A protein has these predicted regions:
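Basic, alpha-helical nucleic-acid-binding regions used in initiation and control of genome expression
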Residues: 152-153, 477-542, 546-639
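Extended alpha-helical scaffolding segments
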Residues: 1-124, 133, 144, 149-480, ...
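Cys/His-coordinated zinc-binding microdomains
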Residues: 135-138
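Flanking scaffold residues of small Cys/His-coordinated metal-binding clusters
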Residues: 129
Length: 639
């Protein structure tokens, strides 16, 4: 018994749940907005399936005498206009099947795996594996995507829509919105290439090349607009309600598309060649490709659907990468427009979007370039030149990944606001700065020596302020631990008289009573633990000669010419070694008669190390290193 596309085997997701319907219900729900998704459809098949449904619904409505509103209306239109060509599998060999030409007389008919019917190419190293049979639903999706396949070698020519990169518009949720928007764009299209040398078509079958006798490489100018072509493939029934495929493996495509442009409204076009913009050969999926697909560029014309479709709130960019009969991958990106506001990216909005895109791409380029010098700073050139280059490449790649999608989403959101060049640039700069901070945090996390990392941070901070007007290091909000230690140190300092300080300074190994009285202000839990108590005992000796307040410990160590190697050792040490180096730094301050110094960070360093709080410890290390590096840099600049 033949399988018809009007039989209820297509699973759809609707507001009430999931159900199985025929093609007429799919078309009806596409136009009433209740079709949410196809659970059985792969994501890479979305653009081909939406295109097939949009072309079909556009043509059915064009050649119908009355509006198509209900499922029964669509069924009547399908039956009256396509008739026996609604058979998916099991029809007469001498008549066309849905999306399948008559193969009799075209050559040897051979069995064909159902996977190769689709547009992806199966292989042992691909996710997609070869299958000989499939359900009617899977086979239907494969047929709709069939002519999107590129040339697959001898006997497997490409289809007319081979590997098109597409831009679909809708509400960002339902597939119905994308089908209806694209169908409306076809309604409004005036073709420039397709059908320019042919008579006006009179019926839907004129557009369905699979419903006509096979012609090899028929010029696109002689075909009606729009059309659905085919490959030399047919489905045949298999056991268990499944279907398999047969093929005539001959060269020669059904359509000679010339440049490849067949006036599809959702396809960006290359300015230089007039052909479709594709992910071919060296062009890979990237943020630049996505910007060009939606905003256009000097090399790419925006797809006309952005002007022709009714107001929409999202754009979906899809593409398949390929090279020499090899599928590289499938990519898709969804973007909100105007913060969810329904609008059209028409001529005026399109021009503004194009200008915003140029500025956003420039910001991404500048942000990536900002990493060059700073990323090479933490690594000695003689030993780690190759290593630093690898880290630089990784950091720039990570930054571009973060900014790529964000840059296009940001400018699409800005369309909801009135034009304001300065405000827009501030938004773009803030976006770049936020990404640079995150990438830099990860990039420097593995640097063993904090001082070179601090110098690199200062270099990046300067570049960010110069290019984006944004700092790398935002104002440090005091942590609860830091605030508490800061308050304790001020309390200790306030209660120490000159006599108390003299007593502490003159003490040898044992702390005097004055020191223990000062230590009474320390947190009890720290004094109960030997490791944290040692930190407080060491720092109270500093208060014998140094007042709490003024410059940070890093800046003071730099001012007193404390050796850089000792600072690095201090910041990298742990446990008892750290306590010893803190004591050494304290003695250095006292011996150099430092009058005022904010000791908070060095206490936080010791306490967090003892507690095993690595995150808080790294923050303290960073503050000390930055203070030291900043003061050294200032002194060298002044020299």
């Amino acid at each position: 018994m033949p399988v018809l596309v009007t039989d209820p085997f297509i699973r759809i997701r609707v507001p009430d749940g999931t159900t199985a319907v025929g093609l007429q219900d799919v078309l009806a729900r596409s136009h009433d907005g209740t079709l949410i998704d196809f659970p059985g459809m792969r994501s890479d098949q979305r653009a081909p399936v939406v295109t097939a449904l949009a072309v079909l619904s556009h043509l059915l409505r064009r050649y119908s005498a009355s509006p198509l509103l209900t499922s029964q209306d669509w069924l009547d239109a399908l039956q009256s206009q396509l008739g026996d060509a609604l058979v998916l599998a099991g029809g007469s060999d001498k008549k066309p099947q849905f999306l399948q030409p008559v193969l009799v007389g075209l050559g040897d008919i051979k069995p064909f795996n159902i996977t190769e019917t689709d547009h992806l190419m199966a292989a042992t190293r691909h996710v997609l594996k070869v299958a000989d049979v499939a359900t009617p639903e899977m086979a239907l999706y494969a047929l709709m995507a069939s002519t999107w396949r590129h040339h697959g070698g001898v006997g497997h020519p490409a289809g007319a829509r081979s590997r098109l990169l597409t831009v679909l518009v809708g509400d960002g949720v339902t597939i119905a919105s994308e089908v209806a928007s694209l169908a409306c764009a076809y309604d409004m299209m005036t073709p420039n290439i397709v059908g320019t040398a042919t008579r006006k078509p009179g019926r839907i079958r004129d557009h369905m090349l699979w419903a006509q006798p096979w012609k090899t490489e028929e010029p696109v100018a002689k075909l009606p607009f729009p059309f659905i072509d085919c490959r030399r493939i047919r489905l045949v029934p298999a056991t268990g309600g499944l279907v398999s495929a047969v093929v005539v493996a001959e060269n020669g495509t059904r359509v000679d598309t010339g440049t490849g442009n067949i006036d599809d409204p959702h396809v960006p076009i290359q300015v230089s060649t007039g052909g479709p913009y594709k992910l071919a050969v060296k062009r890979v999926w990237s943020y630049r490709v996505q910007h060009a697909a939606v905003a256009g560029s000097a090399e790419v014309s925006r797809p006309r659907i952005l002007d022709l479709a009714p107001a929409y709130s999202s754009v979906r960019i899809s593409g398949i990468g390929f090279d020499k009969a090899t599928t590289k991958g499938a990519w898709e990106a969804l973007y909100r427009i105007g913060r969810g506001k329904k609008m059209k990216l028409g001529q005026s909005e399109g021009n503004r979007l194009s200008e915003l895109s140029s500025r956003a791409l420039a910001v991404v380029h500048d942000a990536s370039g900002s990493l060059y010098g700073p990323m090479l700073q933490p690594y000695p050139k003689r030993l780690y030149q190759k290593t630093s280059a690898l880290y630089l490449t990784r950091a720039q790649s990570l930054l571009r990944d973060m900014l790529g999608h964000a840059s296009l989403q940001t400018i699409l959101d800005l369309l909801a606001d009135p034009p304001d060049t300065e405000a827009e640039q501030r938004t773009l700069n803030a976006m770049a700065a936020a990404a640079l901070r995150e990438v830099w945090r990860e990039a420097t996390a593995g640097v063993r020596d904090p001082l070179p990392a601090a110098r690199a941070s200062l270099q990046l901070d300067y570049q960010m302020r110069d290019k984006f007007g944004e700092p790398l290091m935002t104002e440090n909000a005091s942590t609860p631990l830091g605030a508490r230690i800061h308050a304790v140190l001020y309390d200790m300092d306030a209660h120490l008289s000159p006599a108390n300080r003299a007593s502490i300074r003159s003490a040898a190994t044992e702390l005097p009573l004055d020191a223990w009285l000062a230590l009474a202000a320390a947190p009890p839990e720290d004094m109960e633990r030997p490791d944290t108590r040692q930190v407080w005992e060491t720092v109270v000796r500093a208060l014998g000669g140094v007042r709490q307040g003024g410059p940070g410990i890093g800046a003071v160590l730099a001012d007193t010419r404390y050796p850089e190697a000792r600072v690095s050792a201090l910041l990298r040490a742990n446990g008892d070694a750290l306590i010893g180096l803190i004591a050494e730094a304290v003695r250095w301050l006292v011996s150099h008669e430092v009058e005022r110094c904010t000791l908070t960070d060095i206490v936080v360093l010791g306490i967090t190390d003892a507690r095993g709080d690595s995150a808080a410890r790294e923050e303290a290390v960073s503050r000390i290193a930055l203070g030291y590096a900043r003061r050294v840099r200032r002194d060298r600049a002044a020299a």
